């Protein structure tokens, strides 16, 4: 129902929901849910699910993202099919042409994030600057992510989260890492919305 989506912190979808056979109701129901989310300014979150779904028609997905999606979650294989770029950082950067925030897992190499912040509010990192296809890409990694449309002077910001090395010396399996990262992000979105509702004048928003 529309009122459920209207009161939600986010609408989370998988790519499978819109790539079904002609005439099946799942796609129409998903698109209706997206329209409700857009109507009530609820962020739409999409997980790409598998590279094979994306490889079938990458341009269709690019158009779908630009029209409907706020936050994109993917792994490096899905990112390659979507953008044609094998580097997860530059693939995430390209995806910012279509969405406001990107999470891209890179197997045992950790997680990349890319998003927008207001130029005037950028926050310098206290960590060492990292090399990459975008030089010193983590310079403003402490900045608060914003929707691009809410920025007067949008600035792209990036970060990298390395794997936690308190466990095994060699990471053998990263299944579920992206789901865990997305869960943390969704928790932050929900907590921020709850705090904004209950303490509307807080400087933390």
What are these regions (language model features)?
Residues 171-181:
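Glycine/serine-rich anion-binding loops at beta->alpha junctions
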Residues 1-168, 190-201:
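Ribokinase/PfkB-type carbohydrate-kinase core domain
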Residues 180-184, 201-204:
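Short amphipathic alpha-helical face segments that pack within enzyme cores
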Residues 183-191:
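Hydrophobic transmembrane alpha-helices
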């Amino acid at each position: 129902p529309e009122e459920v989506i209207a009161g939600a912190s986010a609408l989370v979808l998988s790519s499978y929901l819109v790539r079904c056979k002609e005439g099946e109701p799942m796609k129409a129901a998903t698109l209706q849910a997206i329209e409700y989310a857009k109507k009530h300014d609820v962020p739409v979150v999409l997980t790409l699910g598998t590279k094979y779904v994306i490889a079938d028609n990458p341009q269709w997905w690019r158009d779908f993202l630009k029209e409907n999606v706020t936050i994109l979650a993917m792994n490096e294989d899905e990112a390659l099919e979507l953008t044609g770029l094998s580097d997860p950082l530059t693939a995430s950067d390209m995806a910012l042409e279509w969405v406001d925030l990107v999470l891209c897992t890179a197997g045992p190499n950790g997680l990349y994030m890319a998003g927008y912040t207001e130029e005037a509010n950028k926050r310098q990192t206290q960590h060492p600057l990292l090399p990459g296809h975008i030089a010193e890409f983590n310079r403003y990694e402490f900045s608060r992510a914003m929707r691009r449309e809410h920025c007067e002077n949008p600035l792209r910001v990036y970060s990298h989260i390395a794997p936690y090395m308190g466990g095994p010396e060699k990471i053998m399996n990263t299944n579920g890492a992206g789901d865990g990262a997305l869960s943390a992000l969704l928790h932050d979105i929900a907590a921020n919305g709850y705090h904004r509702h209950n303490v509307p004048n807080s400087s933390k928003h």
